[in-house]
Amino acid sequence: MMETESKADTASLANKFEVVDINDYEAESSEPIVPHERQIVDDVIAIWKQDPSTETLGIGKLHAMVKGRHPNWSVSEKRVKTLLKNFGLLTNNANQQFTYANEIKSLNTPDIDLPEKVHIVMTAKRGKGLYAKNKISKGDLIWEESQLFYIAPLANVNLIKGGKACSYCGKLLTQSSSNAGISVLKGLDCNVCSEIWCSQTCKKIDSQLHGMLKHNLYNPNSSGGSKKLINANAYLELQDYCLKEQWNALYAITIIYANIITDKSGIKGKQFRAMARVSQDVRYKALNSSAGAFDNLQGGALFVGEQQEKLWKDGYNRFKNVFPKSVDNGDISYQEFMYMMGTYNINNLDSCIYLTQSHLNHNCDPNTNVETSTTVRTNGLKVFAARDIRAGEELTTTYVNPAYTVQQRQRELRVNWGFMCGCQKCKEDLKCQQRRKSSSAPAAKDDKGIREMLMDTKKEIGDQEIELEIPSSYDGERRKSVRFDEKVIAVSE
């Protein structure tokens, strides 16, 4: 009886478990194949992603790793080298990698209210930069600023439309604060749509543009048959399109351009056009030359050139529909649209645009810390001295994670900002890697010697077993390993 119950319990428990595949693992065919060039490049990138230290390996070892992962692939060491060279992925081939820093242009920034401790210097090599007027001590607050153009999180668009996040800043609203009755009493709800603001401050900043972007009621056709400044219906369609395509840059430049054309002073537009500026299609060349390396390493998808251009043109047509008057005036060309997108992509911080901060150039070991609020994005940013800064020294920030390997940093900088970094940290990291390579050479010779010794021993003793003395004590513990590329058991209750 007990045995029957035990079997029933076991069967019941077994029903609660499911064997599942993870990481999209599929058994590879054992039939020999000649892989497509894209498969080879993607596999090398995957190796680098899993272990960044492998980026410094020579072609021979890299080829061996590819073959080890895909024994059925018919691919030579020469082909691997040729493909990496063609796609600009040889780490020792920096001179042949595509850069576009020389195509980035900027102008003197008009009407900028600079912090007391810094001034702008324009140089031929680094473009515009911020330099210390006097000595700045470590930890000093150098300046703080609000966004020139604030962009709410694209991911929160549906929450904003449903009154569950602030219409301006995108901050998630609590159940009590989003309650219709309470928001009406506080005057934070929109009297036309279902959107709500989180505070009077956000409502005051956003109320005019909110009405123009989202309500044709407040933006009727002008008399005389002239076109609208902003077509709200077209904007709402573009907003949904951006969410569907996860196209943050198009979403952002639409909000930026709406701010520019409604700014009666005209200063915002001049300041945006004075920033470091490059066309998005030029930036794409760097991505394409890397076989989409950066995008693949970030888990994204790479469009082929024709698909990408089609997407840009679709986005451009939707952008034009939002601003019919600007189209009539000839203010929006496809070229200008591409420049706006490129400008946004190389200047934004946390999706927003800051005026003074955008003048900071890069260093992998920066002398400033730029801090943004993780809870209240509208609080802007604060810039502190990371160490003592000399008078006349350039202020720098880091565009990438300094903890990345030098190859990862170089790749991100080249693709996203168009230059190969030559800072002191990069030079030292490369020297350190070279020293490690040199020190590993004697170890390789020792390995060869051990193999020769074992071969000689085998010749002497033939098939006899070798007895090895077992240590009387062993304090180590073998590290447990789990493979995550095949099958695991998941509880389904």
Curated annotation (Swiss-Prot):
State where it is primarily located.
nucleus
Where is this protein found?
Answer: Nucleus; Chromosome; Cytoplasm
Q: Which residues form the SET domain?
A: 116-400
PROSITE patterns associated with the record: SET
The record's EC number reads: 2.1.1.-
Q: Name one GO molecular function term.
A: histone H4K20 methyltransferase activity
From which domain of life does this come?
Answer: Eukaryota
Q: Which InterPro entries would you find in this protein's record?
A: SET_dom, SET_dom_sf
Q: Which SMART domains match?
A: SET (SM00317)
Q: Which cysteines are joined by disulfide bonds?
A: none
Give the GO terms filed under biological process for this record. methylation; negative regulation of gene expression, epigenetic
What this protein catalyses is: L-lysyl-[histone] + S-adenosyl-L-methionine = N(6)-methyl-L-lysyl-[histone] + S-adenosyl-L-homocysteine + H(+)
Q: Which UniProt keywords apply?
A: Chromosome, Cytoplasm, Methyltransferase, Nucleus, S-adenosyl-L-methionine, Transferase
Q: Which Pfam families match?
A: SET
Record bears the keyword Nucleus? yes
Q: Name one GO cellular component term.
A: cytoplasm
State the PANTHER family in the record.
HISTONE-LYSINE N-TRIMETHYLTRANSFERASE SMYD5, SET AND MYND DOMAIN-CONTAINING PROTEIN 5
Q: What family is reported?
A: Belongs to the class V-like SAM-binding methyltransferase superfamily. Histone-lysine methyltransferase family. SET5 subfamily.
Q: What does this protein do?
A: Histone methyltransferase that monomethylates 'Lys-5', 'Lys-8' and 'Lys-12' of histone H4 (H4K5me1, H4K8me1 and H4K12me1, respectively), thereby controlling gene expression and remodeling chromatin structures.
Q: What is this protein called?
A: Histone-lysine N-methyltransferase SET5
Question: Which organism does this record belong to?
Answer: Debaryomyces hansenii (strain ATCC 36239 / CBS 767 / BCRC 21394 / JCM 1990 / NBRC 0083 / IGC 2968) (Yeast)
